[in-house]
Amino acid sequence: MTQQRVSSVFIETVPIVLASASPRRRSLLEQLGLLFKIVSVDSEPLPLSSEHPLEYVIRAAKVKAFAAAALEPRSVIIAADTVVIYTKDDVFEIIGKPQSGNDSFSMLSRFQGGKHQVITGCCIVWPLEENITSVQYEIFYDTASIQFGQWDKDILSSYVSTGESNDKAGAFSIQGIGAFLIDIIEGNYTTILGLPLPQLVKRLLKRKAIKVVLNKNSEETISSDFLTYSR
């Protein structure tokens, strides 16, 4: 499907590839007004037994990004991975996507009344340039937390029956029907959706992969050299 550019603060200067089939990540990039290509890669690794959640999301994002970069070497590749961390008695567990409706119900039941962390790791692979043979990439991550409310089992069961939880980390969608499950959010909303936009945009601007639109009618742009970035 051909993308139509919408009114935007930014415009891309090089081809951009999103290495994800996630509708949430696609929607977030589209909201920026950028045109990009989606390359879905079947390269998501499983967590290792002794691997910290942060190490895992960074590794998973890097694996996805490098797989897409092999297919699109002249593009900026954006890849990400998100996990929900269930913590009890100082022991953490990585909660991925449910395998069944029963699995979804079990996850949501465990979350009730608790505060849990969401981690999104990202990897950007920059386009190969002449006389540069090594891959240039950048890793970053962001965390947020969510406080679940207390809900009756029949409500959770009804939510699971909608099918919305099927492909969501933690078995809920904060952007959809499942928003009612959450009492409190701490941190950036886009991190929970799977793509931390503030950190991503700053890096794309710094490497001049996108520019700021100064005059939306003429698409005149201002160089990112004139902008100040927070580290």
Swiss-Prot record:
NCBIfam families hit by this protein: maf (TIGR00172)
GO BP annotation list: nucleotide metabolic process
Name used for this protein in its record: dTTP/UTP pyrophosphatase
Plastid is among the record's keywords: no
Active site: 81
Cellular component aspect of the GO annotation: cytoplasm
Catalytic activity: dTTP + H2O = dTMP + diphosphate + H(+); UTP + H2O = UMP + diphosphate + H(+)
Pfam family, one: Maf
Family recorded in the similarity comment: Belongs to the Maf family. YhdE subfamily.
Compartmental location: Cytoplasm
Residues spanning the signal sequence: none
Source taxon at top rank: Bacteria
